[in-house]
């Protein structure tokens, strides 16, 4: 053919008109009778609009979208081809859904048919051939020729590569259409998408590796390691013949064989094929390279992968005592093939397992059987049972593995998850992922069989009508496991249905496995019983010692004291008995799956515990003070050794503990015993712990063990010394005094007057101390965490470069540090130790073996600075000041430092030289002392020389310039510069040089304008003449030598005649054609850059000392520089580095801010306005980069998209995260370039080489693709595409912008099966091609994946599309930086470091919180989070060895985790904090988690109080669920004692300590309330003289430590001190207190304790979306009330009432100072809990806003609720939702709730006896009469409410009279009582304090018993009363706000402390707040 196809613009051949019938099946087609037929009405004009190919019905999109896209692509040049493609799409759609039952199918068919009718006649006329078949062949062959002609080219640029890809896509689609038309098979044959694509010649969509024939010429396929890996996978020699599997062609590779053998999906096979090839290639390249060892490296790579993939499987087999089924032949080549097949089989199982991936041992079970079948198939083994060849039980059929293996187990998981009832059901009622997986830890799992027996108990799912006797229990029945044809499988609508017949009697629900998650605070004791027993026994010992007044530890060995102390073992026995009872109670519901030996052991242990509980007390009581003594000859404190029978018993009792102690000191032996499967060791370990698959062998090395043991010994010694001296010992004497006092006259009716020793008073005094005793270890941990974390940071060079000044001072060491850390070393350099930290590097030099090392640093530095400019952190001027010139001089070691280092240095040198008097050597040393000054002087001199050499071209002028230069250099050599030159004239010369260079710069800009150029030429000549005269006349002492040269020229001219002398030009002046200076200068970028740099060197002043001005740029540069001095692994070459992926889950969060969102002002100020004020410098830089002056100019220039990006990159958006993570790819390409490029390429520049050197650029892309993959799991992308959501387009735009980005999503669509729509789910991976999303892989799922917490399943479905050996988890509100991405290959080398016994499996990274720069709350939150992710995790990793996974930027050993359950857990509710469970799981499975501080990732946090509180609530909920989880229980039981302490205090212990610190306040206050109201306090003061108890003051002080946030405050200050300096840290800490940080932390304490405690008791944990809004906005009063009413306001009022009552009735003999100290923190807490939401609410004291809030509050409180009314609209709806946690509560939790509510009745009981009206009567009748008053009050309230219902609408006047009557009656009663019974005003106040808590207590009790009273009038009255209470509390809270709002100064003060950080940065907060008020 003579015409060439251009793919973007399809072929244009002169058209010839032919007539043609409508395309359809041929006449002889069997489908003709049933095919679609319709007459088309022809029209004359074709539509110019492309048909919408994106919004298609979900049921059809995957099958027809490619045809419609290609039609749109070729329509302009080949309209008939477009028509045929659309008609073909229509036929497929009609065949798939003939009755149009799918959603949207009918509409789609109608619109497409209309388009076909419109296009038919016009396209026939435009047809160029006689028939449609010929037309198709013509275009198809044209594209085919283009592909053949250009497909082999290797050096295509991007545009040519895109054209070739488009050509392949078009040819592939045309091939399908042509094949259908010519074969006449009808659309039925083409409906199977996969089979047609398999036949396509040209284009198969691929992810990274184009494994089809068309991809062999791509650069990545030419890498030797890829070729080797492909060869391994394609080695099909020796496989069974394909005919055995109904295949007529040889197998393409091993994966195709596995697919046909076991029935895997095509998409899964294609995905895992590429997966394994990439894994193999990356492993091969890292093998030691030897000559002729390519096959050997392949063997070693496969062996390495085998070891990683099957480590868990082989351990599982060993644990169960089964031989593994990985059987290898002896022939080496065959063994390699077998190994590859086993790895491929596991990957295919894993890739299709869907939610079963959370169950790793379930996958082991499946693989175990399939590996056996695979071996049988490969060897041709014959079954002993059937006598036939071994065949896969589930093989052969289409998708048979999914249907027959995965789906039955998935259905069990799904049905069990449904029983969770959205988190309200008790955990014991359903099996979660762990329960189902742990069933495979026992040999009983093999009873399931293979093929699996559907009647097995494992598949039995309890009915939803739970567990009533005789109830039918449902069981999932699955179809019989037989091979079926594809059609039969498609006809099966249900893979599992509930059997309608009664199951067999033996079928039963197995219940929980190994553990039951029970909601109880006892779970904390059970999980950490050793710790609690230790603290209880220590407390008992300390009390005994205090009673004996022990002052020295040696006194304990006094016989009597020692014997008393030994009584602690009686307590120990009791505690073990309690533990044994709890174990049986808590595991009762797991008894069905518990081995019989385990049941026996539990009973035996309980029996032994009961026996010791009896024996020890009996022996102790009988042998007390009865000793048998022995005397020794040693004169020591052991000179007399006495013992008793009790001591002998204790010795026997402690035998087991002694063995544990010995094993503790030899961790290797204990680890071997735990992990060994030998029978003896099984027996030895059987008694201690239940034999579980996980939790064994977690011991650390002796060095690590010593470090954390030493840490905890210090903590415990400090804690016990403090507790003994300040808490316990001071309490002994007051206790004895209290016990001696006899109380006769109580001030109330004492219920137990006969109790001796004032036991209640002793409890009231001791209880707060006990609470603090159990809590204050957390405080001491925080103190030592600060000390050790700070010491560790100093030793690891943290904060070595903190400021710009320090950066400038150390900048000369950065090149050497950079090359030592980030540049791969040659073989010679690998042995050389890198210099670190405090030792200087070679100034500006790399290693001797790499002369270009400095050039590499310069190139990377400039890339980093350019990225700053791209991100608008710096301006164009700052860019010039910070970049370093890259020229050939760098290779010779001449360094040209960035100008911001040299700022003011040259002018300072001039000032020094100008007035200097002395010798040259002294001046030289003075200038040389400042290296940057020396470099500045030297560079200015060399630059001036260089410019003059180019500028001056006249012979005489050149001689003069050379003469001057020679004079200068000669004087320097002879040290006579000060003698030969007058330095005083240097400033004048400086000014003239500036003038000269400015003219040169101006000339280069104006060189196109001739007239302007001539004018500048004249000025330039004059400037040169001025310089010449200044130097020769004023500066040079012997300037006459230079003048002689000039005069000699003039003298030589006399011989030529007077005429010639007259016309001779002046020096530097041009005449005619003769030019003395070359101006304009040559058009050279490097020359222009050098002139510009010279000008900056001459002109830049002190202002450049603050470059860069942007704070974030400063921080990033400082950290990057500091990290170069930290200990990090050597960098490998990119080709040898570990490959990795990044995975980001995304739900419905912002991707990019839309234009409307940017400018919308509905709820507050617009986002763009906010951004302009918060980031003013970055906005200015952005405008400069865009070349615009303001926002309006941007809009006029059409740069709205750039504006959207700029704003989105400053919010918490997905686009920001994607941009940051794609820096990893950019960094890898640059590093690969540095690895491969020669010196000339480096000097040319990375970007220039990438554009010009296509083969090198293709190779860089190939390496980057092989090493890095980024997958974003957009859960809703499919639904968004279908609905036309703009978010879908935003995601597509991201893929187009970053071509290597991949998006995974779940598609839910309806498929028509037997004319019935059925929901089917697919996991899909897409990429962007030609502006559209193109599907790469499609894997069918067994059902909806989101049956758990959501986010883990979102990660789980996408993890199969990730690649590499490592996986980094990144949230969508994170950021990354180019300079940090350079360190990724160093970080990945950590996996190859073996620290201790195990290599790391999770690498922890530090985070920078980037949202703390504006509001004070955001500042507090960022500092709090920063301290946790730095100093906190630093200590957790080393020395404590208990760092887990906390989400965000951690890097996983990918293969380790995909074979052990994934990177998170997903069971509903219990795994609410899904991330941390990955860390628990890793630790329990003997993984190792480290923390690395040399690399950081950005992280966003919430910035408003409400958002922060929701986040805190979510974390507290998650921690409460962790408390009752099996993971925490096993860690607590399996760790050694000191590591267990670390685990507790760094996980749930922090929250439990916070809870008991608050409980301690309640105990103290209620204890004091008891003492005051009962009259005991008065008696104790008067008779026992008990006044101030120091221990109580200590207890309250300890509580205040937690309350005021010092647990996080101390580490925070230390970390700030390390990174910014301790003076700044102290200043920040003081400033935080002035900004009410104590209020914030006290308020946060209330949030944590409320949600932690409530969730443990009642459940109700749920994910709480915070919104992550970028704008800090005002929250209205009703919103604050809903959020904080029950968590803070109620408790705040309760504390305040307690304090008021105590203040009213306390006895004044107490010291006022002591009382103030004790109660201050409580007053502060109550005030904070009531007021903080309003103090931290922007514009919270603005009158206009206050008025609006009051209206909204009244509307909300009065609105009636109902079905569908949200809680933000109605008080009643909110009130009902607020009790949701009680609906799923058990009887025990409800009873405890009632018991806790009884505390509100204490007020009434105590206060009624202190009324004047009672006249000191303490009879119980007084209390009874008080209830009469309460009932009368309730009756009155009910009467008024009833009257409102009856009369308020129609008989309003009657209702008013009724209210007047009630009011008068109450007033009359009060007056009567005042006159007759002496009722006083104080009585009325006290009555309110007494009766209000009682009413609230009744409401709480009614809520607890709601199921019993709901629907009765009592419940209706409860609602009325609760509304009244809420209204009253709202009024009390609102009144002070309204009063303060009248004072303008309050609002100004609030704005100042809320936004102080912004004021410090001079940001414009007032316009933002003003904008908010305006837009309300």
UniProtKB/Swiss-Prot annotation:
The keyword Transmembrane applies. Pfam families: FKS1_dom1, Glucan_synthase, Vta1. One of its GO terms (cellular component) is plasma membrane. This is Putative callose synthase 8. The keyword ATP-binding does not apply. Belongs to the glycosyltransferase 48 family. It is found in: Cell membrane. GO terms for molecular function: 1,3-beta-D-glucan synthase activity. The chain crosses the membrane at residues 531-551, 566-586, 603-623, 649-669, 708-728, 760-780, 1545-1565, 1596-1616, 1621-1641, 1689-1709, 1716-1736, 1791-1811, 1820-1840, 1857-1877, 1885-1905, 1929-1949. It is a multi-pass membrane protein. Its EC number is 2.4.1.34. SMART domains: FKS1_dom1. It catalyses: [(1->3)-beta-D-glucosyl](n) + UDP-alpha-D-glucose = [(1->3)-beta-D-glucosyl](n+1) + UDP + H(+).
